[in-house]
């Protein structure tokens, strides 16, 4: 037996060794990972490895750990914090968190945070504690405190109202929760405050002053007004400019408005606005529906005032006088309102044809007609005087056209002759007068002289004249001030303001009547004028314009001998002097011909434009170009315009031949010599001498300004003897010195210098004068001592 037990113990020891002996064949960690990955890939195993890669976790284990952590964090935890605790990828944590939020009704995923109902209940309890302490809580502030979205928090708290939270949500502003005690206290304050108000008050001011909740104030105020607890009304709804108006004020306001209208007959909109009425016009229309009020810009007027005005206007019309309505008008009315009111009164009375409104006065037409009659004698006297002094400006372009129409028949009979003469002139074979020779050019295309006026029927003439008189508007009868002076003498019972307005109204009809009177006097005077002398005047004019025309051509020839800059200066001078003279002569002739008058006033640029404006288009066009060419720089352009204008006016322009040019040169030289003999001013002596020497050496006439004298002397340097040029240069330097001294003397007279040495300056001036006087005779002799050229030279 002992041997058997020994064998058993030996076998047991071998078995024990076999159990505790390590096996030689086992799986490595790498193989295990590959096996697990293969199983996961084949979807036979659902596990997630940790971030450190040392462990595998099942999704169920992740869910259990999430719920455990949510419980440990009192019902609210961030998903990012869960990822750090569980140590798996954030994607798996978010996925399991979403699964939990979907499967568990008491758990929600809000902005990356898991929140359960237990947390929300505790939050509601905390909010209730704050609410009971303060009486109100602001959900927006709770959102900041608990870092939760407003809609979610509002929904969660609203679900617990009456159960956990003892309060109520504001129906107009769901962002506020109040207790019933707070609402009652607030309502009592609002009721007490508005019960003490006796005038319109802006609700927004009370909100800022007492710190009320805006929505509570409007809702409770509306409730109190509807329940008749407050006697008043809210105007403007729930806007910032809403106003509470107590009934006691509305009653007092209505009483005041009604009383004011009854006593004064008008209501001012601004006064009602100051009373607290925001829309005065609609208020008046509703309050006085049955009253016939006239609404103006700033006020409304009752029938009492309108009836008074109508009675006064009717009396003025019936008595053929005037009436000032200002005393009957409310003083608060603006000028615009006064005009609207008075025009409405005249329109309602239908008396626009019987009376006229002058500011605040109504004047009957009979009174105005009587005032116009006061000026008839003065009008006749002034018309006669105007015809004598200034007949050129009395006839307008319409009169010219009408007068031309009267002569159309007689003019057409001469058309063939003019066309024939025009053709001959173009061929160079026209008639030549006054020794013009073959070089003369006769220009005669259209003649617009108004002959044959007496041959027209007197009735037709009267008809045309009367049609044109109404269009005269250039001759003014009297100024407003002069009319006022006459009215002050004749109308004694009128105020200055009324006379001023009346004069302004009378000025236009008086001027119109005056034009008719002037035209009548003018036509009667011109019809009896001496027509026999017109041919003589025409002949003189023809000769004068031709002489000026040829002189300008000769001046242009002399101008071309200078440089371009000097040519421009001399040309401008010729245009401003001689060319302007011939333009004035031609326009005077046109004015006399087209306006049946031979007289003319001193011509200026303005007068020329005025005359041109009255001419017909066919005559005005070339003459306007002629007038504009005076402001140009080229004499050739002016001559071209002059030829066209003379052609239009029926005048002959003849280019002079050699003989006539020599005659013109001789006459021009003699005239300059006469001026030189009588000249005493050194500057004038130098000017005339230079021009005469220029004509002697070039046989060209020159018409140059004083500032071109140095250029003329420079031109003569190579043309005259050296001693003469030296004398001219010496004399020129003395003249310049004299002009400088005279300029300094004028400055000293204006501003006396301190410590000026008068005697020395006086001696220098006297010495300069003596030297100039001694040389003046020599300068004159350089021209006057030469033999006089003959006319045929």
Swiss-Prot record:
Residue spans of biased composition, Gly residues class: 427-439
Keyword list, A-Z: Chromosome, Cytoplasm, DNA damage, DNA repair, Endoplasmic reticulum, Membrane, Nucleus, Transferase, Ubl conjugation pathway
Region described as Required for E3 UFM1-protein ligase activity: spans on this chain: 2-212
GO CC annotations on file: cytoplasm; cytosol; endoplasmic reticulum; endoplasmic reticulum membrane; nucleus; site of double-strand break
Short name of one Pfam family: E3_UFM1_ligase
GO molecular function, one term: UFM1 transferase activity
Key word Cytoplasm present: yes
Subcellular location, record wording: Endoplasmic reticulum membrane; Cytoplasm, Cytosol; Nucleus; Chromosome
Basic and acidic residues: compositionally biased ranges: 767-781
InterPro entries from the UniProt entry: Ufl1, Ufl1-like_C, Ufl1_dom, Ufl1_N
Stretch list, region Disordered: 405-472, 745-793
Any one biological process term the GO annotation gives: DNA damage checkpoint signaling
EC number assigned by the record: 2.3.2.-
Functional note: E3 protein ligase that mediates ufmylation, the covalent attachment of the ubiquitin-like modifier UFM1 to lysine residues on target proteins, and which plays a key role in various processes, such as ribosome recycling, response to DNA damage, interferon response or reticulophagy (also called ER-phagy). As part of the UREL complex, plays a key role in ribosome recycling by catalyzing mono-ufmylation of RPL26/uL24 subunit of the 60S ribosome.
Family listed: Belongs to the UFL1 family.
Subunit structure of this chain's protein: Catalytic component of the UFM1 ribosome E3 ligase (UREL) complex. Interacts with E2-like enzyme UFC1.
Protein name: E3 UFM1-protein ligase 1
